[in-house]
């Protein structure tokens, strides 16, 4: 029986969350492509330069912008939440590549999960905090 050489490519993963969004991120050595749910990142994020800049930010800080392909499975929430979840997932994956990256990413704030979520609506109120108009008489 012949033994086959299987070429293994290093895959680094990280999970990011923001609001209601969850992004499972895989970093693969490559040329800097962003693929979100099987769609190129530029078209998925509606060609918004802000969303793309947020998603690539951890790689840009470390100077690794065109060295890794980013494959993302994002679900829940909207584009803002998903873009921030991708950023957190990429930052966590970069920490698994090299633990020395942690100090740089931590000082930039990319490893901090944003705890702000939508506040629930309370009964007797119109929204979470908006009360109906008060009439004294």
From Swiss-Prot:
A GO MF annotation of the entry reads: RNA binding
Residue ranges of region Disordered?
106-137
The family note in this entry says: Belongs to the universal ribosomal protein uS9 family.
Query: Which stretches does UniProt call biased (Basic residues)?
Result: 118-137
Q: Name one GO biological process term.
A: translation
**What keywords are annotated for this sequence in UniProt?**
Chloroplast, Plastid, Ribonucleoprotein, Ribosomal protein
| NCBIfam families listed in its UniProt record | PRK00132.1 (NF001099)
Top-level lineage group = Eukaryota
Provide the protein name. Answer: Small ribosomal subunit protein uS9c
> Which InterPro entries does the record cross-reference, listed alphabetically?
Ribosomal_Su5_D2-typ_SF, Ribosomal_uS9, Ribosomal_uS9_bac/plastid, Ribosomal_uS9_CS, Ribsml_uS5_D2-typ_fold_subgr
Q: Where in the cell is it found?
A: Plastid, Chloroplast
What is the phylogenetic placement of the source species in the record? Eukaryota, Rhodophyta, Bangiophyceae, Bangiales, Bangiaceae
Gene symbol here is rps9
Q: Can you quote a single GO CC term?
A: chloroplast
